[in-house]
């Protein structure tokens, strides 16, 4: 059997979406967007900010910074 491929990006985005964790998205041009992730696919992230929805293309994103730590199944502390 093959191991399932770990998709950390999807796990992270899904967790901030499900837990309504506010995020700051830093774009490659230096611009910052603050809001809540409402959805995502392979190419875009839907961000709700100030009552508006923004579709942000992933290729324009440099960093996504959550307001608080995100617990994904891949980042849990496991004994060595």
From Swiss-Prot:
Disulfide bonds: none annotated. GO terms for cellular component: cytosol. Keywords: RNA-binding, Stress response. GO terms for biological process: regulation of DNA-templated transcription; regulation of RNA stability; regulation of translation, ncRNA-mediated. One of its GO terms (molecular function) is RNA binding. Residues 10-70 form the Sm domain. InterPro entries: Hfq (IPR005001), LSM_dom_sf (IPR010920), Sm (IPR047575). It comes from the Bacteria. Homohexamer. Belongs to the Hfq family. RNA chaperone that binds small regulatory RNA (sRNAs) and mRNAs to facilitate mRNA translational regulation in response to envelope stress, environmental stress and changes in metabolite concentrations. Also binds with high specificity to tRNAs. This is RNA-binding protein Hfq. It comes from Desulforamulus reducens (strain ATCC BAA-1160 / DSM 100696 / MI-1).
């Amino acid at each position: 059997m093959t191991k399932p491929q770990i998709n950390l990006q999807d796990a992270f985005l899904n967790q901030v979406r499900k837990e309504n964790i506010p995020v700051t998205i830093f774009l490659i041009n230096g611009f910052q967007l603050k809001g809540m992730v409402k959805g995502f696919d392979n190419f875009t992230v839907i961000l709700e900010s100030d009552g508006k929805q923004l579709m942000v293309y992933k290729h324009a994103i440099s960093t996504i910074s959550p307001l608080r730590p995100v617990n994904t199944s891949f980042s849990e502390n496991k004994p060595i």
